[in-house]
Amino acid sequence: MGLSIGIVGATGQVGQVMRTLLDERDFPASAVRFFASARSQGRKLAFRGQEIEVEDAETADPSGLDIALFSAGSAMSKVQAPRFAAAGVTVIDNSSAWRKDPDVPLVVSEVNFERDAHRRPKGIIANPNCTTMAAMPVLKVLHDEARLVRLVVSSYQAVSGSGLAGVAELAEQARAVIGGAEQLVYDGGALEFPPPNTYVAPIAFNVVPLAGSLVDDGSGETDEDQKLRFESRKILGIPDLLVSGTCVRVPVFTGHSLSINAEFAQPLSPERARELLDGATGVQLVDVPTPLAAAGVDESLVGRIRRDPGVPDGRGLALFVSGDNLRKGAALNTIQIAELLTADL
């Protein structure tokens, strides 16, 4: 017997991928309902040969649902996730609204589902940030072998992580200047870009070392930098893990990448790391990971694994990870958690 599933934010970028994956993975759903904001109410979305009418998430009655997959932003999740949970629905939330709540497990399906997901006093499970997500299946394997103590990370985050607005901004700017792009070889001001709205500087043919928003705490960090630290600690179960991150937006449509320098308590050679990662769940070992290769792939791609000479005693590794921020980074992990929950419901 199947479960009754709802997608809140079904008309959005991640919601679209969720709908596709539910079908592709033959999720055991006896009934499916789609929810979004009031402006999408009444719109019809195709699913498994049916036309399903979108409901207003703020006014719809969630009774009868077993699981609701939320990807409608933090403001919606803060209000509606508890309302759905109060109706007996298990909520899996893709926003940042609940990640820091000590009573809400923050789960990556391959990493900490068994340890954390069965205890959910608020009826909510949080999905991590897409940048953190790409690294977790890789780092968990290495942590189990040699105990992770420190991470220094630079991220290379695709514009789809900013939603449809980020995608549109990159495409518009690239189209506007592509005819004379060679002029930028010698002078970054040689061409006039359409004014940026989503980012603080043009994103086409550029990188912007400020992904997210600056946090008003004197640290000089963005919320993306801080998510990387907090979420890595919570997911891996290492509360004292040292994490320094610089999150950068790059002119890539889909696929977040991370350059990682990892320090361990015990020696760990590149050869042993490759042996551990080859065939690990949620991981694909490759020579040169790229975001283009990762787009549309379920696993995190990891490669360029080498000794970090800045860490003594063979306790440091440098590596590069790429992952699809819309697929595993958001929609897929949510659905994998739902699949694992079927045994509980």
Swiss-Prot record:
<dbReference type="Pfam" id="PF01118">
    <property type="entry name" value="Semialdhyde_dh"/>
</dbReference>
<dbReference type="InterPro" id="IPR036291">
    <property type="entry name" value="NAD(P)-bd_dom_sf"/>
</dbReference>
<feature type="binding site">
    <location>
        <begin position="160"/>
        <end position="161"/>
    </location>
    <ligand>
        <name>NADP(+)</name>
    </ligand>
</feature>
<comment type="pathway">
    <text>Amino-acid biosynthesis; L-lysine biosynthesis via DAP pathway; (S)-tetrahydrodipicolinate from L-aspartate: step 2/4.</text>
</comment>
<dbReference type="GO" id="GO:0051287">
    <property type="term" value="F:NAD binding"/>
</dbReference>
<dbReference type="GO" id="GO:0009274">
    <property type="term" value="C:peptidoglycan-based cell wall"/>
</dbReference>
<dbReference type="GO" id="GO:0019877">
    <property type="term" value="P:diaminopimelate biosynthetic process"/>
</dbReference>
<comment type="function">
    <text>Catalyzes the NADPH-dependent formation of L-aspartate-semialdehyde (L-ASA) by the reductive dephosphorylation of L-aspartyl-4-phosphate. Is essential for the growth and pathogenicity of M.tuberculosis, and for the generation of the bacterial cell wall.</text>
</comment>
<dbReference type="GO" id="GO:0009089">
    <property type="term" value="P:lysine biosynthetic process via diaminopimelate"/>
</dbReference>
<keyword id="KW-0560">Oxidoreductase</keyword>
<keyword id="KW-0028">Amino-acid biosynthesis</keyword>
<keyword id="KW-0521">NADP</keyword>
<keyword id="KW-0486">Methionine biosynthesis</keyword>
<dbReference type="InterPro" id="IPR012080">
    <property type="entry name" value="Asp_semialdehyde_DH"/>
</dbReference>
<dbReference type="GO" id="GO:0005886">
    <property type="term" value="C:plasma membrane"/>
</dbReference>
<dbReference type="InterPro" id="IPR000319">
    <property type="entry name" value="Asp-semialdehyde_DH_CS"/>
</dbReference>
<keyword id="KW-0220">Diaminopimelate biosynthesis</keyword>
<dbReference type="GO" id="GO:0050661">
    <property type="term" value="F:NADP binding"/>
</dbReference>
<feature type="binding site">
    <location>
        <begin position="39"/>
        <end position="40"/>
    </location>
    <ligand>
        <name>NADP(+)</name>
    </ligand>
</feature>
<feature type="binding site">
    <location>
        <position position="99"/>
    </location>
    <ligand>
        <name>phosphate</name>
    </ligand>
</feature>
<dbReference type="InterPro" id="IPR000534">
    <property type="entry name" value="Semialdehyde_DH_NAD-bd"/>
</dbReference>
<dbReference type="GO" id="GO:0071266">
    <property type="term" value="P:'de novo' L-methionine biosynthetic process"/>
</dbReference>
<keyword id="KW-0791">Threonine biosynthesis</keyword>
<dbReference type="GO" id="GO:0009097">
    <property type="term" value="P:isoleucine biosynthetic process"/>
</dbReference>
<keyword id="KW-0457">Lysine biosynthesis</keyword>
<dbReference type="InterPro" id="IPR005986">
    <property type="entry name" value="Asp_semialdehyde_DH_beta"/>
</dbReference>
<dbReference type="GO" id="GO:0004073">
    <property type="term" value="F:aspartate-semialdehyde dehydrogenase activity"/>
</dbReference>
<feature type="binding site">
    <location>
        <position position="249"/>
    </location>
    <ligand>
        <name>substrate</name>
    </ligand>
</feature>
<feature type="active site" description="Proton acceptor">
    <location>
        <position position="256"/>
    </location>
</feature>
<comment type="pathway">
    <text>Amino-acid biosynthesis; L-methionine biosynthesis via de novo pathway; L-homoserine from L-aspartate: step 2/3.</text>
</comment>
<protein>
    <recommendedName>
        <fullName>Aspartate-semialdehyde dehydrogenase</fullName>
        <ecNumber>1.2.1.11</ecNumber>
    </recommendedName>
</protein>
<feature type="active site" description="Acyl-thioester intermediate">
    <location>
        <position position="130"/>
    </location>
</feature>
<feature type="binding site">
    <location>
        <position position="227"/>
    </location>
    <ligand>
        <name>phosphate</name>
    </ligand>
</feature>
<dbReference type="GO" id="GO:0046983">
    <property type="term" value="F:protein dimerization activity"/>
</dbReference>
<feature type="binding site">
    <location>
        <begin position="11"/>
        <end position="14"/>
    </location>
    <ligand>
        <name>NADP(+)</name>
    </ligand>
</feature>
<dbReference type="Pfam" id="PF02774">
    <property type="entry name" value="Semialdhyde_dhC"/>
</dbReference>
<dbReference type="GO" id="GO:0009088">
    <property type="term" value="P:threonine biosynthetic process"/>
</dbReference>
<keyword id="KW-0843">Virulence</keyword>
<feature type="binding site">
    <location>
        <position position="325"/>
    </location>
    <ligand>
        <name>NADP(+)</name>
    </ligand>
</feature>
<dbReference type="InterPro" id="IPR012280">
    <property type="entry name" value="Semialdhyde_DH_dimer_dom"/>
</dbReference>
<comment type="subunit">
    <text>Homodimer.</text>
</comment>
<feature type="binding site">
    <location>
        <position position="157"/>
    </location>
    <ligand>
        <name>substrate</name>
    </ligand>
</feature>
